[in-house]
Amino acid sequence: MFHRPVLQVFRQFARCQSTDSLSAILERSMNKVQLLGRVGQDPVMRQADGKNPVTIFSLATNELWRSGENEVFQPAGDVNQKTTWHRVSVFRPGLRDVAYQHVKKGARLLVEGKIDYGEYTDKNNVRRQATTIIADNIIFLTDLRDKP
C-alpha cells in the first residue's frame, strides 16, 4: 500500500544526498501561479511566423489594506487598494480556443499556470523584457451567459 509513495520519497532523498552532478539536474523545483481576478480586455489571438497561435488577455488582481492605528481590529481608517495587471498567455490548443471564444472583459477568472520572463525586440529594434503567466487551467467564476 505505501510501497510506491515511500519509494518516490526515497528517490527524492537519494537525489538530494548524492554529490553526483547529474542528480542536481534532476532535482525537483516548482513554478506555479494562481491568480483570481477580473479580465481587463477581451482576448486577442496572435501567431508569429511558423509558431503556434496564442491567446492573450490581461487580468487584474487587487490587494486591499486598511491604514491607520489598530488596522486589524478597527473598522475606522482608510481602505487602500492596489491593482496589479498580469498578462496571461494561453498556448494549449483546446484551452486557447475556449479562452479566445469565452473570456470577456470584466469576467471573473481563476487562472492557474506558471510565470515566464522573456525578451523580445520591438519594432524599433529595442530589446524589451516581458513577464507573462502561461495558463494551464482557467476556471470561469462568471456565468458565460452573464454580461459582466
UniProtKB/Swiss-Prot annotation:
The keyword Mitochondrion appears for this protein: yes
Gene Ontology CC terms: mitochondrial nucleoid; mitochondrion
Assembly and interaction partners: Homotetramer.
GO molecular function, one term: single-stranded DNA binding
All copies of domain SSB, residue ranges: 30-142
NCBIfam families per UniProt: ssb
Organism whose genome encodes this protein: Xenopus laevis
Biological role stated in the UniProt entry: Binds preferentially and cooperatively to pyrimidine rich single-stranded DNA (ss-DNA). Required to maintain the copy number of mitochondrial DNA (mtDNA) and plays crucial roles during mtDNA replication that stimulate activity of the DNA polymerase at the replication fork. May also function in mtDNA repair.
Main location group: mitochondrion
The protein's name in its UniProt record: Single-stranded DNA-binding protein 1-B, mitochondrial
Keyword DNA-binding: yes
GO aspect biological process, one term: protein homotetramerization
Classification via InterPro entries: NA-bd_OB-fold, Primosome_PriB/ssb, ssDNA-bd
Cellular compartment(s): Mitochondrion; Mitochondrion matrix, Mitochondrion nucleoid
Superkingdom, natural source: Eukaryota
